């Protein structure tokens, strides 16, 4: 959650964390989904991709390499729609470099 906020990404919904059936109506508003735990959410993400064309990210941002890969996947998915809706693209490489500089 904090990582996405650091990148300036607005979180649409966190399911199942504190969510109810009423929150499900907001799911199609997301540009992509994140499935940090395959045991919880993979079936839903697969359904949303199949029926609504909504991509998902399976990489869990733990450790330097997986976190960098996760951020690059977020960037790829954001940049599919950002030029149309926000009239710009995003480059998170400087964030990755800064976060890994002293490790």
From Swiss-Prot:
Cofactor: [4Fe-4S] cluster
CC per GO annotation: chloroplast
Keywords on record: 4Fe-4S, ATP-binding, Chlorophyll biosynthesis, Chloroplast, Iron, Iron-sulfur, Metal-binding, Nucleotide-binding, Oxidoreductase, Photosynthesis, Plastid
A single BP term in Gene Ontology: light-independent chlorophyll biosynthetic process
E.C. no: 1.3.7.7
Biochemical pathway: Porphyrin-containing compound metabolism; chlorophyll biosynthesis (light-independent)
Residue spans crossing the bilayer: none
Location in or out of the cell: Plastid, Chloroplast
GO molecular function: 4 iron, 4 sulfur cluster binding; ATP binding; metal ion binding; oxidoreductase activity
InterPro entries hit by this protein: ChlB/BchB/BchZ (IPR050152), Nase/OxRdtase_comp1 (IPR000510)
Enzyme type, top EC level: oxidoreductase
Entries under Pfam families matching the protein: Oxidored_nitro
Domain of life, per lineage: Eukaryota
Main localization category: plastid
Cofactor binding annotation: Binds 1 [4Fe-4S] cluster per heterodimer. The cluster is bound at the heterodimer interface by residues from both subunits.
Keyword Metal-binding recorded: yes
Catalytic activity: chlorophyllide a + oxidized 2[4Fe-4S]-[ferredoxin] + 2 ADP + 2 phosphate = protochlorophyllide a + reduced 2[4Fe-4S]-[ferredoxin] + 2 ATP + 2 H2O
Similarity-based family: Belongs to the ChlB/BchB/BchZ family.
Assembly mode: Protochlorophyllide reductase is composed of three subunits; ChlL, ChlN and ChlB. Forms a heterotetramer of two ChlB and two ChlN subunits.
Function: Component of the dark-operative protochlorophyllide reductase (DPOR) that uses Mg-ATP and reduced ferredoxin to reduce ring D of protochlorophyllide (Pchlide) to form chlorophyllide a (Chlide). This reaction is light-independent. The NB-protein (ChlN-ChlB) is the catalytic component of the complex.
Protein's UniProt name: Light-independent protochlorophyllide reductase subunit B
